[in-house]
Amino acid sequence: MKEVVVSETPKRIKGLEFSALSAADIVAQSEVEVSTRDLFDLEKDRAPKANGALDPKMGVSSSSLECATCHGNLASCHGHFGHLKLALPVFHIGYFKATIQILQGICKNCSAILLSETDKRQFLHELRRPGVDNLRRMGILKKILDQCKKQRRCLHCGALNGVVKKAAAGAGSAALKIIHDTFRWVGKKSAPEKDIWVGEWKEVLAHNPELERYVKRCMDDLNPLKTLNLFKQIKSADCELLGIDATVPSGRPETYIWRYLPAPPVCIRPSVMMQDSPASNEDDLTVKLTEIVWTSSLIKAGLDKGISINNMMEHWDYLQLTVAMYINSDSVNPAMLPGSSNGGGKVKPIRGFCQRLKGKQGRFRGNLSGKRVDFSGRTVISPDPNLSIDEVAVPDRVAKVLTYPEKVTRYNRHKLQELIVNGPNVHPGANYLLKRNEDARRNLRYGDRMKLAKNLQIGDVVERHLEDGDVVLFNRQPSLHRLSILSHYAKIRPWRTFRLNECVCTPYNADFDGDEMNLHVPQTEEARAEAINLMGVKNNLLTPKSGEPIIAATQDFITGSYLISHKDSFYDRATLTQLLSMMSDGIEHFDIPPPAIMKPYYLWTGKQVFSLLIKPNHNSPVVINLDAKNKVFVPPKSKSLPNEMSQNDGFVIIRGSQILSGVMDKSVLGDGKKHSVFYTILRDYGPQEAANAMNRMAKLCARFLGNRGFSIGINDVTPADDLKQKKEELVEIAYHKCDELITLFNKGELETQPGCNEEQTLEAKIGGLLSKVREEVGDVCINELDNWNAPLIMATCGSKGSTLNVSQMVAVVGQQIISGNRVPDGFQDRSLPHFPKNSKTPQSKGFVRNSFFSGLSPPEFLFHAISGREGLVDTAVKTAETGYMSRRLMKSLEDLSCQYDNTVRTSANGIVQFTYGGDGLDPLEMEGNAQPVNFNRSWDHAYNITFNNQDKGLLPYAIMETANEILGPLEERLVRYDNSGCLVKREDLNKAEYVDQYDAERDFYHSLREYINGKATALANLRKSRGMLGLLEPPAKELQGIDPDETVPDNVKTSVSQLYRISEKSVRKFLEIALFKYRKARLEPGTAIGAIGAQSIGEPGTQMTLKTFHFAGVASMNVTLGVPRIKEIINASKVISTPIINAVLVNDNDERAARVVKGRVEKTLLSDVAFYVQDVYKDNLSFIQVRIDLGTIDKLQLELTIEDIAVAITRASKLKIQASDVNIIGKDRIAINVFPEGYKAKSISTSAKEPSENDVFYRMQQLRRALPDVVVKGLPDISRAVINIRDDGKRELLVEGYGLRDVMCTDGVIGSRTTTNHVLEVFSVLGIEAARYSIIREINYTMSNHGMSVDPRHIQLLGDVMTYKGEVLGITRFGLSKMRDSVLQLASFEKTTDHLFDAAFYMKKDAVEGVSECIILGQTMSIGTGSFKVVKGTNISEKDLVPKRCLFESLSNEAALKAN
């Protein structure tokens, strides 16, 4: 393990080839034939019976016996295979579907493939084309199969071929039989063979007419024996067309039918001995093996001696089912087996081979992809702010068990000798010693430790206890993202818990209410180096999801900082020095600034304390500049005042690391903010300085709060009397308004909102009123509370809770919401029996007017519990949903990485993106909103660190020239070439076809230049406003020596210079910072962006609410959001819950025009525009009369005449009404003559049978039921369209339903700007690029609606993965099997055994390139540090590189000399 140079390298598996074992292979690898059903030989003292299922030649399962083949014991012998010979062949359940497919493709008489020669040649040509991937190959094979199924007669022997299928569905005995329905052929006249066959039965049927119904069901039974003989006759050339590679011996179709069955080694099916009795419990496989042997021997005996055909078939069926259960016990219901005792009841299924592989606890997921590891510990965690953020306190008793193998060198020999002497029970000590030339470890618990220490040699390895400074990995499950496992330095402490700094809780999502965490100790120097550099806490302060800080101040730290930096915090010198020593352990040097207050005595402010925390002394390089709003920012009263004059000191300004205004709260110190102090230090001065500041802050706040105290009690939430009074007044007013609305509703006078009925309008209005009253009461409550109220302080500084929580405790709890509505009516039209029926009052529908302080009344308590229950269920369901979703995303994206040519590829080298995210930048390094540099902040920083009063300010044109001087050469490098390698002409530069991989870089330089030009323009505008020359252009040559500002008064010059002086130093520094950050933001090759992208989309899912509806601008036009929506998108669902087409109107200002278009789109039924539909019987005629409501048609702006309605009725295909039967009567009536179906009016003649009255009556009723649902206008798939008024006052049409193409083609709609939220519809109408864009847009929309910030690059990657094969593939087992060809990856995901059987049948090869395969085979994957090889230089000069002499060169030279 610790060797630097080894003589033998371990063998590495390059690839796997799958195939089925042929009968010869099964026998060849077998050590013994299992031929008896007896397991133990009773005469030989219950020894395992020879040739039985437990024969010791196949290995042993108990430690006392030894293997009869290799004479090894249980530890050293892996077991050996046996085999058993079946008396008759049986189908293999794994290849059953494939067997049917082969039979469908060949003639059931001569085994020739059912294709013509030309088809054969064409298909073979397609299959043999180089570079055909798995998806294409399976597509071609499906085409071949479909073509064969259509061929009715064999082209080789002329035999008739019908339909081949399974005899029955389900898990009965018939499910494993194949039948061939020779004569069944749809839509063709029957073959002459059928007539002959039917003719043969005529005489039989004449005597036995009851047999007639059975004759129809007569089919050809393709039993395994018959099928085997057919398969043997298949030509090798035809095998390729069936998807089998016949060049390999095991690639013949007959391989897929069992003739010999392998018996697995005994050690994988051990016998469990019973206590105090000689009996043993046998494994399911052993029991099944004995059953198979017994049944096979019965059949063999029957064949030898003669047996009735019925008995014979029953035995054969039983053998078939038993073998199927042995392989896959799910395929057969054990209760259906012939002779099973409990006729059709429930039987415990056995664990067949498939059951051992599949599922979470199966071999693949349980033992290969993930396993339990050594060198790990687990215990409860607790907080310790005195630790540095990159340390973890490890209990000494854990440190004594976890060891690290350290190699003895001349530098550490003395230390390791001391550790050996201490031994395993004293920390620091050692547990084991591995001598250089010995194989076995020596346990230091025993033996003479002094002697061992004395004889310690260089090169020995000592397994010593964990000690301070060792690198360990720390992890908390569930590991939702990369930062759930980080690397810390160990710190050995007493007591029994792991301790960590609270700043690091967020990435682990840990709290201290009993959480446990895991600790792992890497065992090699290389592993330690990788761990601390790649996974170290300091190097992971930001989340790769969006580049925001994730390790930052939390809870108490924020409260402490807020209290220290408050405006009224002043400290004398003693307190100040005490605070400074608190934050530094008393060993750091501080430069104390001058006090803020001199008289009556020296006082320093809390802001000065914090300034020292950021920059303790003049040796510290940290100079940060920052402007940011606090969490609660009240703007200054006058608009003319700057932000820092905020009424509540709510705007932070830091200049040169001095805090000038604002308090330290969550927005400045917490996580998730890109304008926080720690983020600014990190971006400008690196992670070490940010970590130092965070450590100082943790110590200071924890110790400060320990001294000051901070507690919350019942006093803090006791409302004052006037607050109670105000609350009651506000609630009463709201109740009164609600009562007025309810009265209007009951009278039917309530004005409805667009797209809503009266009840929905009432709910919306009452809901609005009640949420408003809660907000008002909340505001009153917050204003009434004292400034030093503990809950209020926590809510204000953002450490815990919100003002809503405070107002719920003090004033009013508010409306309880269940599934987005008020509490529903439970029984008898009311929510609870305490209220009248159909009551809509606030108190009966879940409004809680009490506060938590005053306590809830019983009905309120129940309503509150209902909504609490909903939240609980939601969380539980969501956990499972998002967990599965994350797993699917991870499996689909795991092997994507950035290569050295900047492309994003899968492990099989399929290109997914040409540059990651279009610009090749790392989301982790994004400073702005998905931009690599925040120009404003960088400019302020550059300006402040280069500011010097003596520097001369540049004129506007000089500013632009300086920028050109630096950016010009960079842009000149990025020239554009066309496809033939020629330079692109200047006028063609902006054409879409010349886009290349450097466009993003060009755009960055361009935006940088624009920013500098903006500064120059601002200066020019200021100069113009003061009567000076703008000078955006350089002056003419003849004027260059003259000062342009000569005539300007000095005071104007000075004022301009002081207001806006930009020196050359500032411009150069700014460009230097911006370009450095851009280069640093480039994505490193080898980054596992697929895995990070999957986690970045999966992890926010756990924080989203599950059942979320959102009103898209209009009430009752619900859009699904949250986890279900993300699930729909990534599953590429064909049917989604709320398909909405957003139609942009040509005339979007006019309400009437919008209504006209709505009428064209929304389906209008006859029932919507008809007064009545009545049946009329008179004068021997019967007809249906429909009266149309022309007024409604006019009001709805429907372009509809009565003739159109008549045409629509005749066109309704289901009604089958002739045009001649529909008559228009007058202006608004339509009459439809009614005749029985199939009866023609014109065929009435005297001889024709009169229609019976019943027929007419039934036809009349049928039409009366169906007529109201006839679509007379609009698109039939579209149930509803709503006119939505956007924020900018324009109107758009929101259309519910499918039919994007039809809506786009509707008059009055701008088709090119019409979109839908249904990805597959976009794909079918607009193509794959549009579908990709649609996926990205929809996921972005969903995430932003939940306030989740996810970098767009992750979402783009997901969109590309779903579409890069040219069709939209969902992230599901079906999509994944089309995206990836790797057998092991698919098998480790879902449907394990199906993929393995498929791989064996189609003889797939797995190149072992992807992540899953490498983990299963224990290899390094080609991602991250595995994506390159380190090659060492040999230092051999070229002169020394001469070819070696050949072995017989001297002899041949001598022979040549002799010949001469």
From Swiss-Prot:
One Pfam family, short name: RNA_pol_Rpb1_1
Subcellular location: Nucleus
Gene3D superfamilies according to UniProt: 1.10.132.30, 1.10.150.390, 2.40.40.20, 6.10.250.2940, 6.20.50.80, RNA polymerase ii, RNA polymerase II, clamp domain, RNA polymerase Rpb1, domain 3
GO terms under cellular component: mitochondrion; nucleoplasm; nucleus; RNA polymerase III complex
Reported effect, N509Y: Temperature-sensitive
Miscellaneous field: Present with 6020 molecules/cell in log phase SD medium.
Enzyme Commission designation: 2.7.7.6
Binding site for Zn(2+) 1: C67, C70, C77, H80
Family the entry assigns: Belongs to the RNA polymerase beta' chain family.
Reaction(s) catalysed (UniProt annotation): RNA(n) + a ribonucleoside 5'-triphosphate = RNA(n+1) + diphosphate
InterPro entries: RNA_pol_asu (IPR000722), RNA_pol_N (IPR006592), RNA_pol_Rpb1_1 (IPR007080), RNA_pol_Rpb1_3 (IPR007066), RNA_pol_Rpb1_3_sf (IPR042102), RNA_pol_Rpb1_4 (IPR007083), RNA_pol_Rpb1_5 (IPR007081), RNA_pol_Rpb1_clamp_domain (IPR044893)
Positions of the UniProt region annotated as Bridging helix: 858-870
Primary role: DNA-dependent RNA polymerase catalyzes the transcription of DNA into RNA using the four ribonucleoside triphosphates as substrates. Largest and catalytic core component of RNA polymerase III which synthesizes small RNAs, such as 5S rRNA and tRNAs. Forms the polymerase active center together with the second largest subunit. A single-stranded DNA template strand of the promoter is positioned within the central active site cleft of Pol III.
CDD domains the UniProt entry points to: RNAP_III_Rpc1_C, RNAP_III_RPC1_N
SUPFAM superfamilies in the record: beta and beta-prime subunits of DNA dependent RNA-polymerase
The organism of origin for this protein: Saccharomyces cerevisiae (strain ATCC 204508 / S288c)
UniProt-listed NCBIfam families: PRK08566.1
Chief localisation class: nucleus
Amino-acid positions noted as binding Zn(2+) 2 in the UniProt annotation, renumbered to this chain: C107, C110, C154
Residue sites binding Mg(2+) per the record: D511, D513, D515
Subunit field text: Component of the RNA polymerase III (Pol III) complex consisting of 17 subunits.
PANTHER family listed in its UniProt record: DNA-DIRECTED RNA POLYMERASE SUBUNIT BETA' N-TERMINAL SECTION
Keywords noted in UniProt: DNA-directed RNA polymerase, Magnesium, Metal-binding, Nucleotidyltransferase, Nucleus, Transcription, Transferase, Zinc
Protein name: DNA-directed RNA polymerase III subunit RPC1
